[in-house]
Amino acid sequence: MTVQTFYLIGEKERSTRELDVGDPKTVNALRQGLAEVFNILSAEGIDFHDCHGPISTIESILRSESVGITVNGHPVRYPQQPQGIPIFGNHFEIYPDHLGNHERLFNKYGSVIRTNNMGRVTYLTNDPDIAALAFRDNDYFTKAPSSASHPLYGIRDQTALFLCDTESPAWKEAHKFIPPSMTPRAVRHYTPLLQQSVDTVFNVLDKFDNNGQAFNVYHLTAKLASQVICQLVLGVDLHHFDAVDSPVHPIIVLLQRYLTLNRRVQTKGAWYSYLPFGDPVALKNTRRELYGLIEEAVITCQKKNGGTTGDLPIQTAALHATCLVDYLARATDEHGNKLRHEYILSNTLALVGAGFVTSSAFLSWLIYSLVEYPGQQDRLLQELVDHGAVSDKRWTYDEIQALPFLDAFVKEAQRMHSPSFQPARNVKKDIILPGGWALPQGSILIPSIPHLHHHTAYWENPDRFDPDRWRTEKVKNRHRSVYVPFAAGPRSCIGFNVALQEVKISLAELVYRYEFVNATNEGIEYDPDFIVIRPVNFYVRAIRRTEWPARSP
């Protein structure tokens, strides 16, 4: 038996332990064992010290009186936060510009920061090594919106794939049925439906052009994204573009209100959510009303398709379904089981909600990138012409995937202007992260997507819009977690194939038909009270094209 005393430098009194280390053959084997004992998530970062300084051999470690441990050259340390004020904590240090202020705090305090927002404590990181660990669902991290500090707590639903805890019984069942509806094969089947939905916007854009009228881009893309997603999920035409002033469908009105109210409640202390008036009550009432409308839509869709369709194997059902609700009603696993009705209802809402909010904001930023960065719109138009675009072109999935500049443009826009920013994960144990950062059990860690995407250590000139960077070996061989627009791991976005095909078809159709011109007379602002980053005051004109470039030689 070989016993040695180990402790974490920076926390010697609390962490000192006498451990039987057996007969370790290598320093790396000892590191692995100690990482498990102390919940250090980067065993390779462990270094050893005695009273004289660093030690690096098994012999020196075992003969020392006691051995201190550092992680990646750092003692154990706790993330810092700005000095708060009573009741409000750091609220006014962060909002309204939470993107800019979190960047400032990363620069000041390091790669993991702590914020106290009216009593609600959250940790954020811009370190891709830490993000990669957080996105794993294992003994140390999970996704649990049922935790009161989680950003999705106000809209949690233990029967919905996106909104339930990983440990919820529904997650395993829903995860079995829903992802097959979003595979590349399935998206290939849905591509004509996506294009048909996108093309409905032409009626309104032509009228804007005839009147010489600029428009608020997010107002338009919110209508467009919801038109597309409701056609895809529910098989219903929202008639958003029958006329310039066509009203937004009640489902979408309620959905936007629901998500805004949740953000308002979750960016304040837990106490705020218990108030018997104001936003917390409105959130509950909106939830009830929204679920009612979704249930009506699901039942209507099932009745419409129920008389002429039959059950299909789960792996091929999406290739024959008219929409995702039709798929969920028909998909059958190897045991003849189907997704239960209550799961269909909640996951339909989750699919509509997640698909709408992300795509609507991202489409806005894509149009922003067309008009803000010189030459990009012309390059994209040229590529479309070179690949056979015409006014009545019916794009296939493979044709859209074969447009390299379109792909690079979308990637770069998503890097520069990611609408998603808070893929929160729950810490299951007291842990020590790379860099020696200690987080307590029960805390919330958010890998901050915008700050990962702009990290100067991993991106050359990160504030420069450069689609060509995606052709370089440096970017092709980048750290896997420095670009995570759809998060990563088992709880990543399952709809990314659909989302990317939707925005690519939208760009192909819109850029071929219209030239977009910036009509904004002030700096672009984003909405701090929404669940994604969306521009609120961005205006453009869409001018109908009358001529196109010749094909490249």
Swiss-Prot record:
The chain crosses the membrane at residues 351-371. Heme binds at C493. It is an enzyme of class 1 (oxidoreductase). It holds the Pfam family p450. It is a single-pass membrane protein. GO terms for cellular component: membrane. Induction: Expression is controlled by the asperlin biosynthesis cluster-specific transcription factor alnR. It comes from the Eukaryota. Disruption phenotype: Fully eliminates the production of asperlin. GO terms for biological process: secondary metabolite biosynthetic process. Glycans are attached at N518. CDD domains: cytochrome_P450 (cd00302). Its main location: membrane. Keywords: Glycoprotein, Heme, Iron, Membrane, Metal-binding, Monooxygenase, Oxidoreductase, Transmembrane, Transmembrane helix. Signal peptide: none annotated. It is found in: Membrane. Its EC number is 1.-.-.-. The keyword Membrane applies. Belongs to the cytochrome P450 family. Cytochrome P450 monooxygenase; part of the gene cluster that mediates the biosynthesis of asperlin, a polyketide showing anti-inflammatory, antitumor and antibiotic activities. The first step of the asperlin biosynthesis is the production of the intermediate 2,4,6-octatrienoic acid by the highly redusing polyketide synthase alnA with cleavage of the PKS product by the esterase alnB. 2,4,6-octatrienoic acid is further converted to asperlin via several steps involving the remaining enzymes from the cluster. This is Cytochrome P450 monooxygenase alnD. The lineage of its organism: Eukaryota, Fungi, Dikarya, Ascomycota, Pezizomycotina. The gene is alnD.
